[in-house]
């Protein structure tokens, strides 16, 4: 079977706390690891997507509405639904590792790096579908 869950692929979480949220796969583990002996992926996703902005809104409101709240997580392949979309993960790939997920302070640092990268992509107008709320 071809490996279609690759780094940079956008997926949707279908189970758990983040069900219905869009994620991008940072590092896939097809064979599993010693600590997690099942196929899984380290993902970075959007917990709260940015809201719509209009011209008549003042700068303070625009900055508040364009904030992205990210999360980083280890997710079983069974709980991911891959999409046809992809996203560049090189800007935060080194920060989001399995070691960073173990330690709470490193996890927070990884989230900050991901947040900065996601907000830059959103401001640039790239990957519009990824930054929209999934309506279902």
From Swiss-Prot:
Chief location bin: cytoplasm
Single biological process term from Gene Ontology: translation
InterPro entries: Ribosomal_eL27 (IPR001141), Ribosomal_eL27_CS (IPR018262), Ribosomal_eL27_KOW (IPR041991), Ribosomal_eL27_sf (IPR038655), Translation_prot_SH3-like_sf (IPR008991)
PROSITE patterns: RIBOSOMAL_L27E
CC annotations in GO: cytosolic large ribosomal subunit; small-subunit processome
Claim: Electron transport is one of the keywords in the record: no
Pfam family name, one: Ribosomal_L27e
Localization in the cell: Cytoplasm
GO molecular function: structural constituent of ribosome
Top-level taxon of the source organism: Eukaryota
Function (record text): Component of the ribosome, a large ribonucleoprotein complex responsible for the synthesis of proteins in the cell. The small ribosomal subunit (SSU) binds messenger RNAs (mRNAs) and translates the encoded message by selecting cognate aminoacyl-transfer RNA (tRNA) molecules. The large subunit (LSU) contains the ribosomal catalytic site termed the peptidyl transferase center (PTC), which catalyzes the formation of peptide bonds, thereby polymerizing the amino acids delivered by tRNAs into a polypeptide chain.
UniProt similarity note: Belongs to the eukaryotic ribosomal protein eL27 family.
Protein name: Large ribosomal subunit protein eL27
Phylogenetic classification of the source organism: Eukaryota, Fungi, Dikarya, Ascomycota, Saccharomycotina
Gene: RPL27A
């Amino acid at each position: 079977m071809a490996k279609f869950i690759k780094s940079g692929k956008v997926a949707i979480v279908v189970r758990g706390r983040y069900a219905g949220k869009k994620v991008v796969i940072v590092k896939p583990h097809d064979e599993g690891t010693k600590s997690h002996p099942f196929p899984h992926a380290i993902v970075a996703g959007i917990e709260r997507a940015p809201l719509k902005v209009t011209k008549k809104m003042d700068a303070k409101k625009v900055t508040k509405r364009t904030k992205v709240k990210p999360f980083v997580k280890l997710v079983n392949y069974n709980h991911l639904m891959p999409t046809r979309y992809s996203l560049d993960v090189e800007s935060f790939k080194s920060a989001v590792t399995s070691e960073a997920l173990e330690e709470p302070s490193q996890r927070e640092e990884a989230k900050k790096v991901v947040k900065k990268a996601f907000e830059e992509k959103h401001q640039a107008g790239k990957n519009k579908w990824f930054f929209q709320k999934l309506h279902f």
